[in-house]
Amino acid sequence: GSWSTSRELAFYPNVKFEGIAFRYNAKTGKVVLSAHYEDQSGYVAAKIYLAQITPKGELEVGTMERPLGYDSRDQSLFIDDDGTAYLLSATNMNRDINIYKLDPSWTKPVLLVNTICKGLHRETPAIIKKDGEYYFFSSKASGWYPSQTMYTSAADLGGEWTPMREIGNNSTFDAQFNRISTVGKTCGVWSYHWGAQRKYKTPAGNFPRISIAAFNKGYASMDYYRYLEFSDKYGIIPVQNGKNLTLNVPVTAAVPGARGIKADCITDGACTESSTYFQKSSNAATGSP
C-alpha cells in the first residue's frame, strides 16, 4: 500500500462526520484524522473523533467521545512549533471555545488549557502563530449565511486573550470564515460562500473565497482581491486589475450641500460607487473632476 492507495478505513453507518481534516504527525509517522462526530439522527452527541493511520496499518481510534466530558461541535487542530498538538472545540452549545492539549499521538485530549470567547457563539475555530503570538480566528454561528470574521490574540495559549476584534468587512465578503493557512511567505484566510444552501440560492453556488492576512504585534488585517496567483517562492499574490485614474488629481465639491467639506478623500480609489455628494465636471478619463 501507499499514501495514494484507496481503501476503506472504517464504516460507521449510523454516524455523521463534519469538519473532517487530516494532519501528519512527524513524530509518529502517522496521519491523524479529526472530525466532529454526531449520530445519524439528531444533533446532540457532540463528540470528537480522533484517529491515526499509516498506508498499510489499521485505523487506530484514539477518541470517539466528548473531550474530557465537554460537548464538542466545530473543531480543528493546532500544532505548535514544538510539535505539541491542541484541539480547538466549540462547546457549551456553541457558546464558548475550549482549547485542549493532546497526547503525543494527537488522538487523545489530556488537559483543558483554556476556555475563551465565552458566550460569544463563535464557530469554525482556528489558530495560527506568527512571530511568537497566537491568533485565534472564528466565524459567528449564522447557519449558511455570511458572518463577521473576528479574531483575538495572546502570547500564551493558557493566558489572557485580547477582546475580540473585527477583521475584513462585516460579511467576510459574502462568506463565512473557515480556516487560515500559511502559503509560502504569506497567510491566506479561506472563507466559504455557501450559496447553494441558502433559501435564495446564488448562481455561483458554493465556493471558497481567499483573502490575504497580515500580522503585527497582536493585530491582524485581511484584504479581498477578486483575482489571486499562487507562487512557490512568494506565496499568495494579489492581482489588482485596472488603473487608478484619479490618483493625485485635485477635486472640488460641486454639490451646493457639500460646500466647505473637504473632497480629497473621494479620489482615494476605495469607493467604486457613484457619490451623491461629489460630482465630476467632466466624464473624461483623466483631468480635474
Which sequence ranges carry the predicted segments?
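Small/flexible residues
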Residues: 25, 49, 181, 211, ...
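Signature of short aromatic-glycine-proline-rich micro-motifs recurring in repeat-based ectodomains
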Residues: 21, 178-180
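Disordered, acidic Ser/Thr/Pro-rich linker "stalks" and the adjacent N-terminal cap
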Residues: 235-289
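Beta-rich carbohydrate-recognition and catalytic domains
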Residues: 1-19, 23-122, 129-134, 138-171, ...
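Short, solvent-exposed loop/turn motifs
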Residues: 186-187, 271
